[in-house]
Amino acid sequence: MSNQGAFEGAANVESGSRVFVYEVVGMRQNEETDQTNYPIRKSGSVFIRVPYNRMNQEMQRITRLGGKIVSIQTVSALQQLNGKTTIATVTDASSETAKSEGNGKATPVKTDSGAKGFAKPPAEEQLKKKDNKGNTMTQAKAKHADVPVNLYRPNAPFIGKVISNEPLVKEGGIGIVQHIKFDLTGGNLKYIEGQSIGIIPPGVDKNGKPEKLRLYSIASTRHGDDVDDKTISLCVRQLEYKHPETGETVYGVCSTYLTHIEPGSEVKITGPVGKEMLLPDDPEANVIMLATGTGIAPMRTYLWRMFKDAERAANPEYQFKGFSWLVFGVPTTPNILYKEELEEIQQKYPDNFRLTYAISREQKNPQGGRMYIQDRVAEHADELWQLIKNEKTHTYICGLRGMEEGIDAALSAAAAKEGVTWSDYQKDLKKAGRWHVETY
């Protein structure tokens, strides 16, 4: 989003007007954040530029919105004047959008102005750590080919046309979730698996300002559902919640717009953004996927790239030979999004793909309560832990943030059996680029 207003008046070059970048986690979408000019990303960090004379006020505002500042960095006035930023430790797709730059999740990445929106990948990085038993762990940080970032920005979005809008929740399920396919003909909107795009809904907010963009994980591979490089798809749930004061039902602006949009309608699209959830290039990598609800979107892109015949034909350089395991949490069986696709892959590739459901309102955990995804992880924690220890294994978590604590507890118990402290081991996984999280 090329929107300097998103950073509350950054870049005054007068004396004493130094600009700082706050890295913030835990921001939640609510009425007050809806009045800001930057989106609250589903996961990771939000980066906010703050002039020196507003640092205290911004700290108070962030605290009020439920955020926590985890780092503060400086941006020189000279860099602001030149329109450049060398602080590229951006770890979140919303930050990319707000800054109109690409990012790297764990490694600083500078955007090459001659690369037309493609950010150069970080160099391969060897991380040598010792586990709790003193054994050296050498892990290679994943390398990726050039990743397209911010090819279309809010001030000049791509205008896509809706091809189809299909329901994903079966009869008897809860809520509205749609699979929406857009025509990309006539543009240059390239993307890869694990990225997101921004959607700008029409109209203005209650303050009379144009609606802000919202970010959605892409649900199709780089070649599109038709494997013709002409489409992009989203998996969107209509946001619905009770107003905390009035008790009235409130519907999300953009999600309602998308879930009810008609084929043939034109939509403003920005992006793509994101590097946190990219699939490793190594076809022999193992991939653990832990998802709830629409968090299945990036997982679908991975599975299509790995197993769909047309995709494999379109990607002769990537023929998946590893092992993948999806643990998918939903409330009811009719809420298993893409159920037929998932089970078809499982039947066709039983040696390479394992599918496990956690159906909270139909299944019980060992304590007699509802079976949530973290309960399934606990059930299979020893197996998952052994797989995670393999240096070729990447773990992806996408969906509700509430599952993270339970997942960590389960893996902590499994690791402890071998004298390993999970929290330390997890840090090494993150540094090695093998632990990928996008939760909200």
Curated annotation (Swiss-Prot):
<feature type="domain" description="FAD-binding FR-type">
    <location>
        <begin position="155"/>
        <end position="279"/>
    </location>
</feature>
<dbReference type="InterPro" id="IPR035442">
    <property type="entry name" value="FNR_plant_Cyanobacteria"/>
</dbReference>
<comment type="similarity">
    <text>Belongs to the ferredoxin--NADP reductase type 1 family.</text>
</comment>
<dbReference type="InterPro" id="IPR001433">
    <property type="entry name" value="OxRdtase_FAD/NAD-bd"/>
</dbReference>
<dbReference type="InterPro" id="IPR015701">
    <property type="entry name" value="FNR"/>
</dbReference>
<feature type="binding site">
    <location>
        <begin position="399"/>
        <end position="400"/>
    </location>
    <ligand>
        <name>NADP(+)</name>
    </ligand>
</feature>
<dbReference type="Pfam" id="PF00175">
    <property type="entry name" value="NAD_binding_1"/>
</dbReference>
<keyword id="KW-0605">Phycobilisome</keyword>
<feature type="binding site">
    <location>
        <begin position="370"/>
        <end position="374"/>
    </location>
    <ligand>
        <name>NADP(+)</name>
    </ligand>
</feature>
<feature type="binding site">
    <location>
        <position position="294"/>
    </location>
    <ligand>
        <name>FAD</name>
    </ligand>
</feature>
<keyword id="KW-0793">Thylakoid</keyword>
<dbReference type="InterPro" id="IPR008213">
    <property type="entry name" value="CpcD-like_dom"/>
</dbReference>
<dbReference type="InterPro" id="IPR001709">
    <property type="entry name" value="Flavoprot_Pyr_Nucl_cyt_Rdtase"/>
</dbReference>
<feature type="binding site">
    <location>
        <position position="217"/>
    </location>
    <ligand>
        <name>NADP(+)</name>
    </ligand>
</feature>
<feature type="binding site">
    <location>
        <begin position="235"/>
        <end position="237"/>
    </location>
    <ligand>
        <name>FAD</name>
    </ligand>
</feature>
<keyword id="KW-0274">FAD</keyword>
<keyword id="KW-0521">NADP</keyword>
<dbReference type="InterPro" id="IPR039261">
    <property type="entry name" value="FNR_nucleotide-bd"/>
</dbReference>
<keyword id="KW-0472">Membrane</keyword>
<dbReference type="InterPro" id="IPR017938">
    <property type="entry name" value="Riboflavin_synthase-like_b-brl"/>
</dbReference>
<feature type="compositionally biased region" description="Basic and acidic residues">
    <location>
        <begin position="122"/>
        <end position="133"/>
    </location>
</feature>
<keyword id="KW-0285">Flavoprotein</keyword>
<dbReference type="InterPro" id="IPR017927">
    <property type="entry name" value="FAD-bd_FR_type"/>
</dbReference>
<feature type="binding site">
    <location>
        <begin position="330"/>
        <end position="331"/>
    </location>
    <ligand>
        <name>NADP(+)</name>
    </ligand>
</feature>
<dbReference type="GO" id="GO:0031676">
    <property type="term" value="C:plasma membrane-derived thylakoid membrane"/>
</dbReference>
<keyword id="KW-0560">Oxidoreductase</keyword>
<feature type="binding site">
    <location>
        <position position="294"/>
    </location>
    <ligand>
        <name>NADP(+)</name>
    </ligand>
</feature>
<feature type="binding site">
    <location>
        <begin position="360"/>
        <end position="361"/>
    </location>
    <ligand>
        <name>NADP(+)</name>
    </ligand>
</feature>
<feature type="binding site">
    <location>
        <begin position="253"/>
        <end position="255"/>
    </location>
    <ligand>
        <name>FAD</name>
    </ligand>
</feature>
<dbReference type="GO" id="GO:0030089">
    <property type="term" value="C:phycobilisome"/>
</dbReference>
<feature type="binding site">
    <location>
        <begin position="214"/>
        <end position="217"/>
    </location>
    <ligand>
        <name>FAD</name>
    </ligand>
</feature>
<feature type="region of interest" description="Disordered">
    <location>
        <begin position="93"/>
        <end position="142"/>
    </location>
</feature>
<dbReference type="Pfam" id="PF01383">
    <property type="entry name" value="CpcD"/>
</dbReference>
<feature type="binding site">
    <location>
        <position position="438"/>
    </location>
    <ligand>
        <name>NADP(+)</name>
    </ligand>
</feature>
<feature type="binding site">
    <location>
        <position position="241"/>
    </location>
    <ligand>
        <name>FAD</name>
    </ligand>
</feature>
<protein>
    <recommendedName>
        <fullName>Ferredoxin--NADP reductase</fullName>
        <ecNumber>1.18.1.2</ecNumber>
    </recommendedName>
</protein>
<feature type="binding site">
    <location>
        <position position="237"/>
    </location>
    <ligand>
        <name>NADP(+)</name>
    </ligand>
</feature>
<feature type="domain" description="CpcD-like">
    <location>
        <begin position="17"/>
        <end position="75"/>
    </location>
</feature>
<keyword id="KW-0042">Antenna complex</keyword>
<dbReference type="GO" id="GO:0004324">
    <property type="term" value="F:ferredoxin-NADP+ reductase activity"/>
</dbReference>
